[in-house]
Amino acid sequence: MSLTNFSKLFSDLDSNNSTNEKIEILINYFFSNTPLENACTISLLLGKSNKRFISGKKLRIFFSEIFNQPLWLIDICYTKVGDSAEVTSLLLREHLNMKDKSLNEISINRLIKDLLPKLKHLNEEKQKLLLKKIWQNVPKSNLLVLNKIITGSFRIGVSKGIITKSISKFASIDESIISHRLMGELNPTLENYQFLINKSERLEELNYKPYPYQLAKSFDKKIKNF
């Protein structure tokens, strides 16, 4: 699946207040995705892939230099919006025309594992060239999510509980098992994803599985009558 589909998922989840509908949206997304894309999506939603490739401040500076716009004006817009990724995506809409569709269907996996990491290893001039190319070759509707991923500021109003329940229903696995498997680091690899949705419990998982919790109740009978 592509960045376009992930951006639609972001929009659908962000605009929906119903827990049950968010769960259904996620389940449908998982069914329509490849395992590797699901792994990357889960990692992003849980905030485990929020690596900063370029800072928000540098993103604004680069936009200013690439499109010859006064930085002071961009900074004023930033104070009103409060988010570098969002203000830059809004301003970009007035300056971009897709030159080609080479990145139109780029996968989330390729984006966060291959393309964006290159930004960290380039000097500033080459960073600007690559960033401009990326901006020019993705649909405008994807710019907000793209910039949030670039700046490591991707957040969405979906709790870990909703994500856990969605995976549990999607994979038909007990929710407590999914919750345990999501603990700690979760690198978005095919191997980790296959472990996450594996229906068989391993011995060490059973050993650490918590007992069901129940509140204590008062005992109102005489012990000899018990």
Outline where the language-model segments fall.
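N-terminal nucleic-acid-engaging modules of covalent nucleotidyltransferase systems
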Residues: M1-F226
